[in-house]
């Protein structure tokens, strides 16, 4: 069998939803699904399939499931000849009687399109597919319950269901026939959730079976988040595969990957921070502007996204993130607004001036200078102070049982680099010069040549946090203006290379530090505790 059975694939739909899974076909995460839609909140609708094929000699499984405690059944992986993820996921199965079947799927804004075709063999070949449904939040798991509604609306070989009130409906258009035969599949095991110490067992509902005659023609199913049972699956599938084949052939893999993070979330165009569980975060959005948009000639879209964010300036701050389900905006980030200022100026340099962006920049800098939430204020030395107990404000934002692991209260080093750059870009040269002088006088660790991670730690004058972290690099690069030059800048690089550099990236904390965590594993609390205490980023 192929190597890397638990290698993961992910196909975005362009609206913030996606399909994802493993090469083996079984799910290892709660986020693995064939139809996961973004309806303001992300819902898992179709988790997977149970699939098998009847040929003249026998019946063979084409799917693989993993159940608690450690049961793998059926074992479609025993017949899996190959898996490829490019240009889209495709599995090739080779059966003992000489039959070979290819199964592929492609995801579009209209849903997930699945296809099966016999590529070798002769004689009868009947394919059966049982969809496994949940209709749950993508952060949750489902257990068997009486509230799940198996009622089906059927037309020809198409069917739809409304699993729960308030959850998107599910429709499957097919080129086969549908037999309504409700059942529950119990105790699926998700090993990635288990490794994190989280709930890892799920029951799934299967409303019926779709059947296809592969000896006569290829099979297709179109999975959608709606009630509509009208439509021809064959033509829709052919159109989707044809359109995506043409689009993907024009775009290099890196371009397609970049586009995966640019989504239409309702009426908003935005950038999401990552898959599978992140939504749109301010800090990540503004940092990503350069690579995802400006470097690719999409300054107009960058301006559109930034102007949308500008509508949410409050007391000189932008939200840290937009929560799932449209909850209250979270403003606990000191650096996000400063990254916005830098992204706005870089965007306007290409796309032209924007009164809306300029207004937002002034509101942010005025708010920070005069003082806003969480103790954020310009101090007498011109540097930016921030923080209060129990609140995480920088990118090192892990919390365990309500405790902030890296509070960094005071004047964090990268925040000063962002603050000074924002002031200089906005033409506030006097404030920028004063803060730069204070930075050079106060942040250099004379003993090592590196920079302190925080000065005036815990808002105590003169107290420093000398932890060696990668945050200091922003003072010498990555931003429009460097705060140090020459030997001082080289000393920072040497310190980072000596203590933090690995073949995979930079450690978040030097191994010599008593708080260093050498491994990122275990349960959620253990992982969050190690997130910024040594983990390589």
Language model segments and positions:
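A short secondary-structure junction motif
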Residues: 261-265, 309-316, 340, 371, ...
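Aromatic-rich carbohydrate-recognition surfaces in CAZymes
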Residues: 120, 139-145, 152-154, 159, ...
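Conserved oxyanion/phosphate-binding beta-strand-loop segments in alpha/beta enzyme cores
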Residues: 241-275, 304, 308, 506-516, ...
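Short loop/turn segments at secondary-structure transitions that flank enzyme active sites
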Residues: 122, 133-135, 167, 225-229, ...
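Residue-level signal for inorganic ion chemistry
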Residues: 116, 288, 475
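Catalytic cores of carbohydrate-active enzymes
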Residues: 252, 319-320, 369, 373-381, ...
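Solvent-exposed loop and edge beta-strand segments that line ligand/cofactor-binding
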Residues: 104, 202-211, 268-285, 323-337, ...
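Terminal accessory carbohydrate-recognition/targeting modules of carbohydrate-active enzymes
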Residues: 1-249, 276, 283, 294, ...
